Amino acid sequence: MSNALGRDLAKLVAAVDAAATECGHGAYGQRFHIMPPAGWLNDPNGLCQAGGVFHAYFQYAPFDVEGGVKVWGHATSRDLMTWDYVGAPLLPDEPFDCHGVYSGSALAEDGHIRVLYTGNVKLSDADGTYDYVNTGRRADTVYVESVDGLAGREFSQKRVVLASEDYPDDLTCHVRDPKVWRDADGRYRMVLGARRRVDGPHIESRFCAVSYTHLTLPTNSLV
């Protein structure tokens, strides 16, 4: 971890995980599906394969079974049936993800696991004016890559590659969950889920990524 908050959060999550593991899940524990040591599990994130190992990251709230601050849990498998929980490598330890490391995706390539995710921030609302749909929320797209090769348990300094101000003006604050892939031409592509400000169906925002550190928005980005 790159800062004191991250280091303290890592210790706290590890302590909760250790205590829960010691207690065990009993007769109701999952035997086939991924199950974290404690708390609440939601969206699978960053599913990828590297060196014969499958990686499944997931939304994990270790402190509350009804949800709460979201981290990324991490489990690995060689057969997609037996999973080992190996920790929580991505924690909300920066101003741009302080209310949760939300969903995203990963690619295993060039000796690294590369991740894009949504950093969730709910702004303080002393006056009660935010509805947290059109106002009061940030959802920046954040990039990290593993610093321990393809193990994917330790990650680099976080970097915002798309700030909330970069999204189209007709979208609400609900823009999240980047899915990235690489085309045959070598270009990276990314899709984000989004909600328009006017009533209507949810849409996708499509971004063309020239590289992980510089994303460009084409004119016909919305479908």
Which residues make up each language-model segment?
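Conserved small/polar residues in nucleotide/adenosyl-binding loops
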Residues: 213-219
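Hydrophobic core segments of beta-strands in well-ordered, beta-rich domains
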Residues: 43-64, 85-87, 102-134, 141-145, ...
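Short coil-to-beta strand junction motifs in C2/discoidin
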Residues: 69-70, 137-138
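Blade-loop segments of beta-propeller domains
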Residues: 71-74, 80-109
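Short loop/turn segments immediately following beta-strands, especially the blade-tip
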Residues: 146-153, 215
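N-terminal regions that are enriched for targeting/export leaders
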Residues: 2-54, 60
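Non-cytosolic beta-sandwich-type ligand-binding/adhesion modules
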Residues: 71-77, 146, 209-212
